[in-house]
A protein has these predicted regions:
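Short hydrophobic beta-strand element within catalytic cores of glycosyltransferases
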Residues: 314-317
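Membrane-proximal helix-turn-helix segments that form the acceptor-binding/catalytic region
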Residues: 123, 139-178, 186
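A charged, aromatic-enriched C-terminal amphipathic alpha-helix characteristic of glycosyltransferases
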Residues: 355-384
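Aromatic "clamp/platform" in nucleotide-sugar-dependent glycosyltransferases that forms part
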Residues: 297
């Protein structure tokens, strides 16, 4: 029986919400598609996310009330499967999880309630060793001792790893419908979970970003989290090598490392670390920049390049993952993809780069294919189809 979307009860379940990034924008897009949905998560940081989520009611698990759950969040990963299985969803018509970790572990406890998982990626700390954020005790929050690190590493990266992988695999099999956020993740889901997934690209607020058709300023931009896996060090090294100006917008665990890298170079003030910037400030930087540098390795999708193209700005990105699906290198040309993950390779492109080779209108048109309104339409149509056929 077909149900009107206005009448259905929807639960949206997210991984812990404690920062503002691409995953949180994706979550907001789902909430825009289903404005009356109830939002669940294991735990959240109200102050850290208030800019985007305001005073919205968020239902939480027992983890929210455990002391130090924010500062020791790596260790509380071990509790999250139970946290998500503790929720009761019997009053809902459909449950939508958005997961990169454990949100999909939930149980609807009813064969009449379909579970749709928007999978941003299978957990990389289980399945992709090289992409683990925590590679040693020095990466932990200051004050956490090596004993705690060894405890964490034993349970996640040690002899129990196969058990966690099996548990994760089984959780994925319980999901009724899977949505991947890119073809890259779709292939990963097939390889790891042996499941088919439909692709719905994440929402990007293209309509809120003004395009700049005028001449660009003579500096490059890196915008995003300052993490090794995002390649911020690669961007900085390449700009130091070519002696070109770079503005770095964002914060993360690599900040001190990047500061030291700049300090030890002959950058002569050309590398500017701006720290956290608001969306409005970020969009302004994008409109003025010569190009966005996006050297992220194994990127699942990548919202930032779409935002840059919406501003009419071309993108220089690593040829892997999401950017290969979103950036066009010909007819029309909206960016350049480099194939060797090496700062010298990136430096070669920066030396020859000319923003006049790119039409801002073409960049904008490319970005419009990923606008939030398209995502909202596709998500509503998908859930409506699920409820009609479940």
């Amino acid at each position: 029986m077909k149900k009107n979307l206005k009448d259905i009860k929807v639960a949206v379940v997210s991984d812990p919400i404690y920062s503002l990034g691409g995953q949180e924008k994706h979550l907001l897009g789902i909430l825009e598609a289903f404005p009356n949905a109830d939002l669940y998560t294991a735990w959240y940081d109200r102050e850290a996310i208030k800019e985007w989520f305001g005073d919205r009611e968020i239902k939480t698990s027992f983890v929210q009330y455990i002391p130090f759950h924010k500062t020791l969040r790596h260790f509380f990963l071990l509790l999250l499967p139970w946290a998500y299985q503790s929720f009761n969803f019997r009053k809902y018509d459909v449950v939508i999880s958005i997961s990169i970790h454990f949100a999909k572990y939930l149980r609807t406890r009813s064969s009449h309630i379909p579970h749709v998982d928007v999978c941003l990626s299978p957990p990389k700390f289980f399945w992709q060793h090289a992409d683990r954020n925590l590679t040693g005790p020095e990466k932990l929050k200051e004050g956490v001792n090596k004993g705690l690190y060894k405890f964490y590493h034993f349970f996640v990266g040690g002899p129990l790893e196969k058990i966690w992988q099996r548990w994760d695999f089984n959780a994925a099999q319980r999901v009724d419908y899977m949505i991947a956020n890119s073809k890259t993740v779709q292939e990963r889901i097939k390889r790891i979970y042996k499941r088919d997934a439909d692709v719905i690209y994440p929402p990007v607020e293209v309509s809120k970003i003004k395009i700049n058709k005028a001449k660009r300023e003579n500096w490059f931009l890196y915008a995003g989290r300052l993490e090794t896996y995002k390649g911020v060090d690669l961007a900085v090294k390449a700009c130091i090598d070519t002696d070109v100006p770079l503005k770095v917008a964002g914060k993360g665990t690599c900040l001190e490392e990047i500061k030291q890298l700049v300090k030890n170079s002959n950058a002569k003030g050309k590398i500017k670390l701006l720290g956290y910037v608001s969306d409005a400030e970020k969009y302004d930087l994008m409109r003025r920049a010569k190009a966005l540098i996006f050297p992220s390795k194994g990127e699942d999708f990548g919202i930032v390049p779409i935002e840059a193209m919406a501003a009419g700005t071309p993108v220089i990105a690593y040829r892997e993952g999401g950017p290969t699906e979103t950036i066009s290198e010909k007819n029309p040309k909206t960016g350049i993809l480099f194939g060797k993950y090496d700062y010298k390779e990136l430096a070669k492109i920066l030396r020859k780069f000319d923003s006049d080779d790119f039409d801002p209108i073409n960049c904008r048109k490319q970005a419009e294919e990923f606008d939030t309104k398209i995502f909202v339409y596709k998500m509503r149509a998908y859930v409506e189809d699920v409820l009609s056929n479940y």
